[in-house]
Curated annotation (Swiss-Prot):
PANTHER family assigned to the protein according to its UniProt record, in alphabetical order: TRANSCRIPTION ELONGATION FACTOR GREA (PTHR30437:SF4)
Gene3D superfamilies documented for this protein: Transcription elongation factor, GreA/GreB, C-terminal domain, Transcription elongation factor, GreA/GreB, N-terminal domain
One example of a Gene Ontology biological process annotation: regulation of DNA-templated transcription elongation
UniProt name for this protein: Transcription elongation factor GreA
Similarity comment: Belongs to the GreA/GreB family.
Keywords on record: DNA-binding, Transcription, Transcription regulation
Species for this entry: Pseudomonas syringae pv. tomato (strain ATCC BAA-871 / DC3000)
PROSITE patterns in the cross-refs: GREAB_1, GREAB_2
Superkingdom field: Bacteria
Organism lineage string: Bacteria, Pseudomonadati, Pseudomonadota, Gammaproteobacteria, Pseudomonadales
Primary role: Necessary for efficient RNA polymerase transcription elongation past template-encoded arresting sites. The arresting sites in DNA have the property of trapping a certain fraction of elongating RNA polymerases that pass through, resulting in locked ternary complexes. Cleavage of the nascent transcript by cleavage factors such as GreA or GreB allows the resumption of elongation from the new 3'terminus. GreA releases sequences of 2 to 3 nucleotides.
Gene Ontology MF term list: DNA binding; RNA polymerase binding
Length: 158
């Protein structure tokens, strides 16, 4: 079975979602199905069919989260000695060599990536170029819009 890296924050978010789905949503859907059943003929009961469909989606999401958690390797970057090298979970400030524009990214697991929040997937072109490099290094990133050079300004374990 393939294991996937996940940050502590990513694991916590999945656990919270799983708890919400199993403790709040699942019981409410069961209650909704019971209430809809009482309305009569199930063949033409839109409320019943909608609740059953939603129940199926919730159960699929629960299975998905449980599978992800089972195959996750949770990495707490704050427990790893700071060497100045970029590793999974670190937060990296980089500057475009040509424009001097800087940006900060945290390198996270595939499921945690959210570019709007500054979280990039470990499998993204930028992250792949940054991994194992050090502060002061210049990396070349091949993107759909062309080749960009970035200098690593700072690596933080937060």
């Amino acid at each position: 079975m393939i294991k996937y890296p996940m940050t502590v924050q990513g694991a916590r978010a999945l656990e919270e979602e799983l708890t919400h789905l199993t403790k709040v949503i699942r019981p409410k859907l069961s209650q909704d199905i019971g209430t809809a059943r009482e309305l009569g003929d199930l063949k033409e009961n839109a409320e019943y069919h909608a609740a059953r469909e939603q129940q199926g989606m919730v159960e699929a999401r629960i299975r998905d989260i449980e599978g992800r958690m089972q195959n996750a390797v949770v990495i707490d970057v704050t427990t790893i000695a700071h060497t100045g090298k970029v590793i999974f979970g670190t937060t990296v400030e980089i500057a475009n060599v040509e424009t001097d524009e800087s940006v900060v990214y945290q390198i996270v697991g595939e499921d945690e990536a959210d570019i709007k929040k500054g979280k990039i997937s470990v499998g993204s072109p930028i992250a792949r170029a940054l991994i194992a490099k050090e502060e002061g290094d210049v990396v070349v990133v091949k993107t759909p819009s062309g080749v960009i050079e970035y200098e690593i300004i700072e690596v933080r374990h937060i």
